[in-house]
Every structure is written in structure tokens, then in C-alpha cells.
């Protein structure tokens, strides 16, 4: 009789469980290290800027954050003007970009024929990848002359004479200024926000939209009453991500804002932002001036972080209302 050879088991169930447990442990360790690296980098960046700005903080005290005087020759530094410019340009950009981005996303998902959706969507995604310096050069050589010859005179003549808001639109026809920087920022963030919203709108179940169309709803009614409420949380999150990007933009703004550290209520006069001021002056700054710029960087970090925290809190509140 021939005996059947039974192969010897090279591993036991207990040994395999031990290897799986070890692999799972190292996997968790790797993920924990990745998260810890991000947190350490975030805290280190903030603390390094705060430590670098300690000299300016000791020199100016708390007045650094609310003073409008910026005079490196006399070692007087007030951050209110660049903070104001940063917030105002970002808000102008979002006021323009949000409705335009919503319109583009609705067009690509609800209105455009199928053969047109892919090329337009691809073009928008390509626009989102263009370097910011290209937008800045376009703004300087194309948008600034248009602002000088047409838009600024029109605003001065028709809106600058109105009560309350007229002060915002009075100024010399220089072309460069806070409003121009807001326009350039809007053009930059529109592809980013519209691409995000388009992907979000595609997650709406087809059955919901088809049911609404079957009841006689128009495309506008479906978009406004079905698509937008269904994706409201994601839309708000995308809006705040776009705002965070606008707050930190540097080169495009530096080309067209005028780089003047003088606080003015007019949107047509030159101004500056935190990022633009740091980019323009950091290379040639003295020790004290460099300390003030580092402290400005810390302020920008706090502003951007606060915006993202507010966005997160709003999303949590919305999710609780929706029962999630």
C-alpha cells in the first residue's frame, strides 16, 4: 500500500493570529505617527512664528494688533492695516465666487448636455491648477487697465456719491487696489469651489431628482429645493475652504493690491494683506522688522485657523439639526 504523504502545516492558527495582531499593531502605530507628525508640524509652525515675533511683541505690546501705524524706520508696527486688507479682499472674493461657483456647478450637473459636461469640467479643473503668479500677472496687465479706464470711473460717478456705501467706492483711477485684488482672488477660487460643488451635487440620488421632475418641477426648483438642501453641509464646507485659500493667497494679491500700508475705507485705493506684506519685505527686513513680519505670520495662522474652526462648528450644528 502506498502511503499518502500529508504536508506538514507550517503555521498554526495561534501563530497566524499572533502575526495578524503584530501587523495590526504596527499599522495602528504608523497611522498614529502620521497624525502626530501633522499635529507636531502645525504646532511647531505656530510656535516658531510666535517665538520669532517675540521682539516685536515686546516692543509694541498689545497695540501691535490694533494700531494702524506701520513705520519700519522708527520701529513702529501696527498690524491692523494688513489684517483689514486680508479680511476685506477675501470677503470680496467670496461674494463674487460663491454665486458664480454655484451657477457653474448647477449648469454642469443639471443643465449642460452630456457631451459638454466633460470638456467644461476638465477646463475648470485645469484652471484650478494654474499657479497663482499667472493670475497675478493677468490681473496686472489685463484687469488693472480695465479697472483704470472703465470700472473705477463708473464706480466713482454712480456709486461713490451714494450715502453710507459711497465712501467705499471713492478714489483715484489707479486700477490697483483692494477691489482689484478681490476680483483676482475670486477668479482664482472659482475653479476650486465650483469643482468641489460639482462633485458634491453628483452625490444627490437620481431618484430624488427624477421624482421632482415627475411632479412637474423645473430645473430651477430641483436645483434650489432638492440639490442644494441635500448638499448644504458640503456646500458650506467648500465655501469655508475657499475662504481659507483666499485668506492666505500671496503672489496674485501682491501684483495688484498696491502694497500700501495705509488704512483707507475705500476699496479703490492701494492696500496690502498679511501675506503680500511678508512676501514683499521679508527678504530685506532688519532684525526687528523681520520679527514684526513673523508675528504677522502668526496672526494670519490664527485667522485662518479660526475660519476653519468656525466652519467645523457650523457643520456640526447643521448635522445635529439634520439628525446625523
Swiss-Prot record:
<feature type="domain" description="ABC transmembrane type-1">
    <location>
        <begin position="83"/>
        <end position="311"/>
    </location>
</feature>
<dbReference type="GO" id="GO:0006817">
    <property type="term" value="P:phosphate ion transport"/>
</dbReference>
<comment type="similarity">
    <text>Belongs to the binding-protein-dependent transport system permease family. CysTW subfamily.</text>
</comment>
<keyword id="KW-0472">Membrane</keyword>
<keyword id="KW-0997">Cell inner membrane</keyword>
<dbReference type="GO" id="GO:0005315">
    <property type="term" value="F:phosphate transmembrane transporter activity"/>
</dbReference>
<feature type="transmembrane region" description="Helical">
    <location>
        <begin position="291"/>
        <end position="311"/>
    </location>
</feature>
<keyword id="KW-0592">Phosphate transport</keyword>
<keyword id="KW-0812">Transmembrane</keyword>
<feature type="transmembrane region" description="Helical">
    <location>
        <begin position="235"/>
        <end position="255"/>
    </location>
</feature>
<dbReference type="InterPro" id="IPR051124">
    <property type="entry name" value="Phosphate_Transport_Permease"/>
</dbReference>
<keyword id="KW-1133">Transmembrane helix</keyword>
<feature type="transmembrane region" description="Helical">
    <location>
        <begin position="126"/>
        <end position="146"/>
    </location>
</feature>
<feature type="transmembrane region" description="Helical">
    <location>
        <begin position="29"/>
        <end position="49"/>
    </location>
</feature>
<keyword id="KW-1003">Cell membrane</keyword>
<keyword id="KW-0813">Transport</keyword>
<dbReference type="Pfam" id="PF00528">
    <property type="entry name" value="BPD_transp_1"/>
</dbReference>
<dbReference type="InterPro" id="IPR035906">
    <property type="entry name" value="MetI-like_sf"/>
</dbReference>
<feature type="transmembrane region" description="Helical">
    <location>
        <begin position="87"/>
        <end position="107"/>
    </location>
</feature>
<dbReference type="InterPro" id="IPR000515">
    <property type="entry name" value="MetI-like"/>
</dbReference>
<feature type="transmembrane region" description="Helical">
    <location>
        <begin position="173"/>
        <end position="193"/>
    </location>
</feature>
<comment type="function">
    <text>Part of a binding-protein-dependent transport system for phosphate; probably responsible for the translocation of the substrate across the membrane.</text>
</comment>
<protein>
    <recommendedName>
        <fullName>Phosphate transport system permease protein PstC</fullName>
    </recommendedName>
</protein>
<dbReference type="InterPro" id="IPR011864">
    <property type="entry name" value="Phosphate_PstC"/>
</dbReference>
<dbReference type="GO" id="GO:0005886">
    <property type="term" value="C:plasma membrane"/>
</dbReference>
Amino acid at each position: 500500500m502506498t502511503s499518502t504523504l500529508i504536508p506538514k502545516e507550517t503555521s498554526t492558527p495561534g501563530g497566524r493570529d499572533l502575526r495578524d495582531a503584530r501587523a495590526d499593531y504596527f499599522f495602528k502605530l504608523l497611522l498614529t505617527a502620521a497624525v502626530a507628525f501633522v499635529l507636531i508640524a502645525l504646532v511647531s509652525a505656530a510656535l516658531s512664528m510666535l517665538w520669532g515675533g517675540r521682539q516685536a511683541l515686546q516692543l509694541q505690546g498689545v497695540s501691535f494688533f490694533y494700531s494702524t501705524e506701520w513705520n519700519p524706520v522708527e520701529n513702529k508696527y501696527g498690524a491692523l492695516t494688513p489684517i483689514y486688507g486680508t479680511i476685506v479682499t477675501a470677503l470680496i472674493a467670496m461674494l463674487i465666487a460663491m454665486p458664480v461657483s454655484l451657477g457653474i456647478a448647477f449648469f454642469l450637473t443639471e443643465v449642460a448636455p452630456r457631451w459638454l459636461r466633460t470638456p467644461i469640467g476638465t477646463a475648470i479643473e485645469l484652471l484650478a491648477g494654474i499657479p497663482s503668479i499667472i493670475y497675478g500677472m493677468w490681473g496686472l496687465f489685463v484687469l488693472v487697465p480695465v479697472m483704470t479706464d472703465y470700472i473705477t470711473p463708473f464706480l466713482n460717478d454712480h456709486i461713490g456719491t451714494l450715502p453710507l456705501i459711497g465712501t467705499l467706492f471713492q478714489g483715484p483711477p489707479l486700477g490697483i487696489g483692494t477691489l482689484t485684488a478681490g476680483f483676482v482672488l475670486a477668479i482664482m477660487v472659482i475653479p476650486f469651489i465650483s469643482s468641489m460643488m460639482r462633485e458634491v451635487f453628483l452625490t444627490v440620488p437620481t431618484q430624488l431628482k427624477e421624482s421632482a421632475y415627475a411632479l412637474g418641477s423645473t430645473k430651477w426648483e430641483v436645483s434650489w429645493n432638492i440639490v442644494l438642501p441635500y448638499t448644504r453641509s458640503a456646500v458650506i464646507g467648500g465655501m469655508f475652504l475657499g475662504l481659507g485659500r483666499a485668506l492666505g493667497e500671496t503672489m496674485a494679491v501682491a501684483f495688484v493690491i498696491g502694497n500700501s500700508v495705509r488704512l483707507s475705507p475705500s476699496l479703490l485705493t492701494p492696500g496690502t494683506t498679511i501675506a503680500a506684506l511678508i512676501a514683499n519685505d521679508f527678504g530685506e527686513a532688519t532684525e526687528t522688522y523681520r520679527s514684526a513680519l513673523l508675528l504677522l505670520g502668526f496672526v494670519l495662522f490664527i485667522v485662518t485657523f479660526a475660519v476653519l474652526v468656525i466652519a467645523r462648528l457650523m457643520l456640526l450644528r447643521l448635522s445635529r439639526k439634520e439628525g446625523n
